[in-house]
Swiss-Prot record:
Protein name per UniProt: Zinc import ATP-binding protein ZnuC
Function: Part of the ABC transporter complex ZnuABC involved in zinc import. Responsible for energy coupling to the transport system.
Superkingdom of source: Bacteria
Keywords: ATP-binding, Cell inner membrane, Cell membrane, Ion transport, Membrane, Nucleotide-binding, Translocase, Transport, Zinc, Zinc transport
EC number in record: 7.2.2.20
Annotated organism of origin: Psychrobacter arcticus (strain DSM 17307 / VKM B-2377 / 273-4)
Disulphide-bonded residues: none
GO CC terms in record: plasma membrane
Length: 243
């Protein structure tokens, strides 16, 4: 990979708690505008990897090094609001640094995510799909050059899942950002990803879905169900969030 296109480098990164190994000898380069999907069983170290990239924890050994000024947008796996906190959608979005984006980019996000009618609503009263759209907007309004989505499909209805798949597909081109998507949704990862990293406390295998499907390490974890994965085709049409 050309150094000028590299956004972030993890070099021989390991993380231990006492004698317990959570991650071992992780080497990952994330390029500008690249989309990477991370899969693995429960306890594989996916959440630990995200925390290391976010800088929430320090590696036991190895280095996590940005190759350019890094602005990370993060959509967490879980988000809860205390019942006593009267937090409106507009309050949460006001915390984002909207001045980073041009007016038309901000409007695109609001239109694409169908947010205008939600602005006065309490976060506590939103559905799972509505909450996910608001969290995604908040991350995008910071104009990240790296967007991390942690299990973005969790708890969504099928219609919202389809919309979000399509929206994720369009994001790198629109915002010129890299994306790291952590997902248990093996069907989407193998059909909709260009580069996949399979994690099980170390990197078992990585590459394009067609390469992973014939990997013995992948088949040990997930079986032989993905020997001929669908070739990804970008979506050209406009898609808006379910209202």
């Amino acid at each position: 990979m050309n150094n000028t296109s590299k956004l972030l480098n993890l070099s021989n990164v390991s993380y231990y708690i006492g004698q317990q190994r959570l991650l071992s000898h992780i080497n990952i380069d994330i390029a500008v505008n690249e989309t990477i999907s991370v899969i693995g069983p429960n306890g594989a170290g996916k959440s630990t990897l995200v925390k290391l990239i976010l800088g929430l924890i320090e590696p036991t050994s190895g280095q996590v090094t940005p190759s350019a000024p890094l602005q990370i947008g993060y959509v967490p796996q879980r988000f809860s609001v205390p019942p006593i906190l009267p937090l409106r959608v507009s309050d949460l979005l006001a915390q984002a640094h909207k001045k980073r984006l041009m007016a038309e980019q901000r409007q695109f996000i609001f239109d694409k995510l169908s947010l205008t009618h939600l602005l006065s609503r309490q976060m506590l009263h939103l559905s799972g799909g509505e909450t996910q759209r608001v969290l995604l907007a908040r991350a995008l309004l910071d104009k990240p050059n790296l967007l991390i989505l942690d299990e973005p499909m969790q708890g969504l209805d099928p219609e919202t899942e389809v919309w979000l798949y399509q929206f994720i597909d369009e994001l790198p081109e629109f915002l010129r950002c890299a994306m790291l998507v952590v997902s248990h949704d093996l069907h989407w990862v193998m059909k909709g990803s260009r580069r996949v990293i399979c994690l099980n406390k170390h990197i078992c295998c990585e590459g394009q879905p067609s390469e992973l499907a014939i990997s013995s390490e992948f088949q040990k974890l997930f079986g032989h169900h993905y020997e001929q994965p669908y070739v990804h085709q970008p979506h050209a049409c406009e898609h808006h969030a379910p209202s």
